Curated annotation (Swiss-Prot):
Pfam families for the chain: Ribosomal_L31
Family: Belongs to the bacterial ribosomal protein bL31 family. Type A subfamily.
SUPFAM superfamilies on file: L28p-like
Assigned keywords, A-Z: Metal-binding, Ribonucleoprotein, Ribosomal protein, RNA-binding, rRNA-binding, Zinc
GO MF term list: metal ion binding; rRNA binding; structural constituent of ribosome
HAMAP family linked: Ribosomal_bL31_1
Free-text cofactor note: Binds 1 zinc ion per subunit.
Biological role stated in the UniProt entry: Binds the 23S rRNA.
Cofactor: Zn(2+)
Protein name: Large ribosomal subunit protein bL31
Keyword Transport tagged: no
Any one biological process term the GO annotation gives: translation
Organism: Rhodopirellula baltica (strain DSM 10527 / NCIMB 13988 / SH1)
Ligand binding (Zn(2+)): 16, 18, 36, 39
Amino acid sequence: MQDGIHPNYQETSVTCGCGNTFTTRSTRPELKIDICSECHPFYTGKLKYVDTAGRIDKFQKKFAAGTYGSLQKKKAKKATK
């Protein structure tokens, strides 16, 4: 291998949004993640909504009426002369 062209491969501290911290190796000194194996529903067996930037709230607000009729487009007004 050539000297000086490869990135520095070092120990990295990974911090999850739930507070879990672990170390691994990477070219970055620190990583911040939203979800890890300690809080992911697949690994914990608990149902948990992972809401990124309020997407669930936005969806519920958009479809709050809940009826199909409210989702249809309104009729166009008659043209006047």
